[in-house]
């Protein structure tokens, strides 16, 4: 049912197999409103979406059991994968629905949905007592539904609830993770937080939930429809998303970009090359009648979301998902806050970061966030352990620490071996590593600016050099350090060493 094809961090490129086709993840499900849909499903497909989601409760309200007789694919005129939500959003907005859990489940079966959701109780942004009740009732309903859904041909989703109460999120996920008759999991109630750009709450909920969910099952994030959240949620293990944001924003004259949402009246230029933006100017869009403007803005918003999904997939394929997180963190203050939180999850994310992927393209490092890039931090930790083990084995001698520039010339490692001294290299982000490890990925594949590195990065390097010097001296080595004062990062590292418990380290300037 779910085939994982590629992994970086906890993000996956995968395939969800359904009765009406295959969904390649990460994937976005545009919400189709059966009451009011300014963009046709054909246009949705043309924008790159072979899957959509619609609300089963609203289908029932409009068509009753007639929709079940025709089937949801025929009602929508959509031949691809259709996911149906149960009406939980209406509970969140209006306090209830007229259908029972059993009726909602049976209705989705008869609709012929490919992916369906039980009638859960969304938490939203409520007090602790209400949140506890939403989790308890959702769990009760999830257990109750077993006799109705076990063995069913469609994929049933277990909704994880708890909102901003992360212990409740974990409890909900822990129970759901043990219910094997659910072949997909959904994390609910993020919309109220996403609307306020409280992305840090959403990613924390995802992180807490994923700890208890089976690795081999896809995970859906309900109500997430902005490109700013996609890379972080995917990096934590979310596979699919849905939202009506593309059309809701369009109705208000709002224009989605990868770095925020603009009102069309505030734009003089369109920073996009999609079919809509290539044909029209902001002024032309503003002068259109409301219906046509809404349709075109919605199409643009869909194209942006589609492009964002492709960008995330490519980053996974290249092993550069962390670098995409860094890039996104500089697009909005809310994502900068999320990035700070992502560094706390590094142990969990590191497990999915392949050691050799992206060797041809290398690793790009920029600043403080790059220190937590799993491919760099893992090499640094491994190198430190290797230095200590080799120093212990050799039991003394002469050691010299030499700088290694980004992307050194081929053969540079070998050219420095010999002379009766043990050669160790040092680099920003990677720390100190022996010549024997020079060439191991990514020591020769890292690229970073040689000027203007943040003080924290230089301080981190100085600290790692000082630690290495202490280890070597403790094993009977005499140590000196070479540097080139003309190279800014090297000169700054030597200066920083004066306050890093290695002020007495002999240094020799050696340029060229």
Swiss-Prot record:
Metabolic or biological pathway, per its Swiss-Prot or TrEMBL entry: tRNA modification; archaeosine-tRNA biosynthesis
Record EC number: 2.4.2.48
Keywords: Glycosyltransferase, Metal-binding, Transferase, tRNA processing, Zinc
GO molecular function, one term: zinc ion binding
InterPro entries given in the database record: ArchSynthase1/Queuine_TRR, TGT-like_sf, TgtA, tRNA_ribo_trans-like
PANTHER family documented for this protein: QUEUINE TRNA-RIBOSYLTRANSFERASE
UniProt protein name: tRNA-guanine(15) transglycosylase
